[in-house]
C-alpha cells in the first residue's frame, strides 16, 4: 500500500486532516496502527489547549421513557459544530449511554461506544476533529418507583437533541390520559416559566438573600418611612417567591389559575410533582 493510500485510509479512520495524517504516516514509518496512536496523542494535546475556552453552545440530549428518563448537556463553542453530523451522532449515542448509566458521569466516561472506544477517548477524538472545546455538562436521571416521567424539547436540533429540554417526574398510580396530558403540559410550562424550585420553601436561600439585598437597595433611597419600606419589601419578596415556585406560578395555558389549582382540578388524590429539571444551552 502506498503512503498516499495509507494517508487516505488514516483520514477515513480518524477524521483528521490531510497534513496531520501525512505527518503521522511519516513519523510511524508507514505503520497505520502507530499512526493512529500518534494522532490520538496529538489530539489529546490539542484538546487540552482548547479546554480553557468558553463552550456556550451545544445540545441537550434526552433519552428514556415514562419509567426512566435521563438528560445530559453536551457543550461546544459554536452552533455550527452543534449541528455537525459527527457531533450530533456522538450526542445521540451518549444520551442512550447516559440513561443506561443513570447519569453517573464517572461510569459514563468509562463506557464503551459503538466504535469500541470509551466515551472519554471518543470525546478527545471529537475535540481534535472539530477543533473546538467540547464538554459534558449537567446530567440527571429520574427513575423513582411509582413515578411517571415526561419531557418537552424546545428548539429541536435533531430527534432527541434540543437547545432546551425539560424532564418532569409525577407520582401517581393513575395511568389515565389526563395524567399524561398534564405531564406533557407541565413540562411545557416549566420550559416557558423557568421555576427555581417546586415550592417557595425550597428556593435556594442564597438566591433569596440576593433578591432581598436588591430590594433593600432599591428602597434605601426611596424616602419612604421605615415601616412602609418594610411592608413593601415583604410584598416584593412574597411576589418573588410566588412567581418562582412552580406550584404557585400562573399556569401558562390559563394564567388566572396557578399550577396547584390545575392539580386540584384533576381530582386525582395521589397525584403530586416529584421533581423536575430544565436545562437550556447558554444558561
UniProtKB/Swiss-Prot annotation:
UniProt main location, coarse: cytoplasm
Region feature (Involved in Mg(2+) ion dislocation from EF-Tu): 78-81
Which Pfam families did the record assign?
EF_TS (PF00889)
Gene3D superfamilies, per this entry? 1.10.286.20, DNA helicase RuvA subunit, C-terminal domain, Elongation factor Ts, dimerisation domain
Q: Which keywords does the record carry?
A: Cytoplasm, Elongation factor, Protein biosynthesis
Subcellular location(s) per record: Cytoplasm
Cite the GO molecular-function annotations of the record.
Answer: translation elongation factor activity
Q: Which terms in the GO cellular component ontology are assigned?
A: cytoplasm
The record's family statement is: Belongs to the EF-Ts family.
Function text: Associates with the EF-Tu.GDP complex and induces the exchange of GDP to GTP. It remains bound to the aminoacyl-tRNA.EF-Tu.GTP complex up to the GTP hydrolysis stage on the ribosome.
**Record-given protein name:** Elongation factor Ts
Record organism: Pelagibacter ubique (strain HTCC1062)
- Which gene holds the coding sequence for this protein? tsf
Amino acid at each position: 500500500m502506498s503512503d498516499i493510500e495509507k494517508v487516505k485510509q488514516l483520514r477515513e479512520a480518524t477524521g483528521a486532516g490531510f497534513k496531520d495524517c501525512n505527518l503521522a504516516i511519516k513519523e510511524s514509518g508507514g505503520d497505520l496502527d502507530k499512526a493512529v496512536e500518534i494522532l490520538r496523542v496529538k489530539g489529546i494535546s490539542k484538546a487540552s489547549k482548547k479546554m480553557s475556552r468558553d463552550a456556550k453552545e451545544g445540545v441537550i440530549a434526552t433519552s428514556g421513557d415514562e419509567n426512566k428518563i435521563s438528560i445530559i448537556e453536551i457543550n461546544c463553542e459554536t452552533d455550527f459544530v452543534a449541528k455537525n453530523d459527527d457531533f450530533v451522532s456522538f450526542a445521540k449515542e451518549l444520551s442512550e449511554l447516559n440513561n443506561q448509566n443513570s447519569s453517573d458521569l464517572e461510569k459514563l466516561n468509562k463506557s464503551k461506544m459503538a466504535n469500541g472506544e470509551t466515551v472519554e477517548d471518543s470525546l478527545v477524538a471529537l475535540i481534535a476533529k472539530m477543533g473546538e472545546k467540547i464538554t459534558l455538562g449537567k446530567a440527571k436521571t429520574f427513575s423513582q418507583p411509582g413515578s411517571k416521567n415526561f419531557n418537552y424539547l424546545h428548539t429541536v436540533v435533531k430527534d432527541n437533541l434540543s437547545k432546551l429540554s425539560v424532564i418532569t417526574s409525577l407520582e401517581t398510580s393513575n395511568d389515565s390520559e389526563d395524567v399524561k396530558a398534564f405531564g406533557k403540559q407541565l413540562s411545557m410550562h416549566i420550559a416557558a416559566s423557568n421555576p427555581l424550585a417546586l415550592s417557595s420553601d425550597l428556593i435556594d436561600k442564597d438566591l433569596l438573600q440576593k433578591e432581598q439585598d436588591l430590594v433593600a437597595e432599591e428602597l434605601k433611597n426611596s424616602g419612604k418611612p421605615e415601616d412602609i419600606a418594610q411592608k413593601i419589601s415583604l410584598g416584593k419578596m412574597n411576589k418573588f417567591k410566588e412567581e418562582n415556585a412552580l406550584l404557585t406560578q400562573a399556569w401558562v395555558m390559563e394564567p388566572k389559575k396557578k399550577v396547584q389549582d390545575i392539580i386540584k382540578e384533576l381530582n386525582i388524590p395521589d397525584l403530586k410533582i416529584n421533581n423536575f429539571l430544565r436545562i437550556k444551552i447558554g444558561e
